[in-house]
């Protein structure tokens, strides 16, 4: 018998002698004939689709194991950069049924419509009838789409579905071919109104066309309603967003003049009280316009610039003006911007990341330039998945 001692980065259990054992957790045992004996941390998956659906990976791990797994993912990323693991705070997990945005797919073969997620490591679809990840209103809206797609999705056609729980209700974008007929147009309006959708848009490959919007669709950030553009980035759960905002505000402290780089719609920029002055830079035009409008209407001291920080990162003479700099880049990290931050003589950096590998890479650049990493807070917004968000505080005296 061999004991499972840890989880590897892809979620497989690992024994002391390095054997990888799928679907196992620490304190499980694997016998010589391959039979797995469950330990105290191995629990029953909560979804009937688990093991087939690719939406979740670790439903059989209890909360203690899952928190340790997310924390270890960050520590391992630092080890890969030949760095000591940072001070890691206890991971925060968003609860089940809390996801407020989702991407699904639907395919019609003959008269059969399949709607759901991809199977694990496959392009095949799993037809879902439940999902413990999603807010119940979001899941209901996804199921409501079945009848609409059954009629209007052409045979052998694929629909990409993006859904967000906005302030006014469900914002739905369907990427699919759609008939340009009066009947089809009226069907969209009737369906969206009947099901109470806030907005329903179609993209046939030529850009997003809003076909139904009963009122301006917004998402509230920092108590400020912000117009929600199509494809805009939004934290996966409100709970996760609140945790990230809390940690960022704690790290920013009493800094008065703050930069928010890769600001998006203003998750952090709009969270501060009016006594702080915030410069926000973002490369997505629609997000910039939405943030500008929201900040102005709320009377927030937020200056917003449309700026591609990969091609035109802030330079040293621009950065030295700020008492604290927040970064929240996409998965690729902020290599170009970090190079300019590293050479600053002093300051405070709050780095929010969704990728341990690029976070550790960028942290190495800062650490080698004399910055100190005080702590990292892991945040699990995607229950039972391999993904982890994190906030880290760097200072240089």
From Swiss-Prot:
Q: Which family does it belong to?
A: Belongs to the class I-like SAM-binding methyltransferase superfamily. RNA M5U methyltransferase family.
Species annotation: Zymomonas mobilis subsp. mobilis (strain ATCC 31821 / ZM4 / CP4)
Binding residues for [4Fe-4S] cluster, per the UniProt record?
47, 53, 56, 131
SUPFAM superfamilies referenced in this protein's UniProt entry, alphabetically: S-adenosyl-L-methionine-dependent methyltransferases
Name of this protein: Uncharacterized RNA methyltransferase ZMO1179
The superkingdom of the source organism is: Bacteria
Q: Where along the chain is the active site annotated?
A: 354 (nucleophile)
The answer, when asked if S-adenosyl-L-methionine is one of the entry's keywords, is yes
Q: Biological process (GO) annotations?
A: methylation; RNA processing
Listed Gene3D superfamilies? 2.40.50.1070, Vaccinia Virus protein VP39
Write the Enzyme Commission number(s) for this entry. 2.1.1.-
Q: Which UniProt keywords apply?
A: 4Fe-4S, Iron, Iron-sulfur, Metal-binding, Methyltransferase, S-adenosyl-L-methionine, Transferase
Which residues participate in S-adenosyl-L-methionine binding? 235, 262, 282, 328
Q: Name one Pfam family in it.
A: tRNA_U5-meth_tr
One GO MF term on file is: metal ion binding
């Amino acid at each position: 018998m061999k004991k499972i001692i840890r989880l590897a980065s892809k979620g497989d259990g690992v024994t002391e002698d390095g054997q990888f054992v799928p679907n196992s957790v620490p304190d499980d045992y694997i016998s010589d004939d391959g039979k797995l004996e469950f330990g105290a941390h191995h629990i029953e998956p909560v979804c009937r689709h688990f093991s087939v659906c690719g939406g979740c990976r670790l439903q059989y791990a209890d909360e203690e194991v899952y928190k340790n797994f997310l924390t270890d993912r960050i520590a391992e990323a630092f080890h890969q950069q030949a760095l000591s693991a940072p001070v890691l705070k206890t991971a925060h997990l968003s609860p089940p049924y809390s996801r407020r945005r989702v991407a699904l797919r639907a395919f019609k073969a003959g008269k059969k419509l399949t709607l759901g997620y991809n199977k694990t490591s496959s392009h095949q679809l799993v037809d879902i009838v439940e999902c413990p990840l999603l807010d119940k209103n979001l899941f209901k809206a996804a199921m409501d789409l079945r009848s609409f797609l059954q009629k209007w999705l052409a045979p052998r056609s694929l629909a990409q579905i993006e859904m967000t729980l906005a302030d006014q209700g469900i914002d739905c974008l369907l990427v699919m071919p759609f008939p340009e007929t009066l009947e089809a147009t009226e069907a969209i309006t009737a369906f969206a109104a009947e099901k109470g959708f806030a907005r329903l848009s179609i993209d046939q490959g030529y850009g997003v066309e809003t076909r139904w919007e009963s009122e301006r669709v917004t998402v509230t950030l920092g108590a400020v309603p912000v117009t929600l553009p199509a494809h805009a980035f939004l934290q996966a759960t409100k709970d996760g967003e609140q945790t990230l905002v809390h940690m960022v505000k704690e790290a920013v402290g009493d800094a008065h003049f703050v930069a928010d780089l890769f600001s998006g719609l203003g998750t952090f920029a709009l969270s501060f009280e009016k006594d702080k002055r915030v410069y926000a830079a973002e490369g997505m035009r629609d997000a910039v316009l939405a943030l500008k409008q929201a900040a102005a209407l709320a009377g927030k001291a937020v200056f917003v610039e449309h700026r591609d920080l990969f091609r035109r990162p802030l330079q040293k003479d621009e950065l030295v003006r700020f008492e604290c700099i927040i970064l929240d880049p996409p998965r690729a990290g902020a290599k170009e911007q970090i190079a300019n931050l590293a050479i600053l003589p002093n300051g405070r950096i709050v780095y929010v990341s969704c990728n341990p590998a690029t976070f550790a890479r960028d942290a190495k650049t800062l650490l080698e330039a004399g910055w100190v990493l005080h702590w990292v807070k892991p945040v699990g917004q995607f229950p039972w998945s391999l993904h982890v968000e994190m906030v880290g505080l760097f200072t240089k005296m």
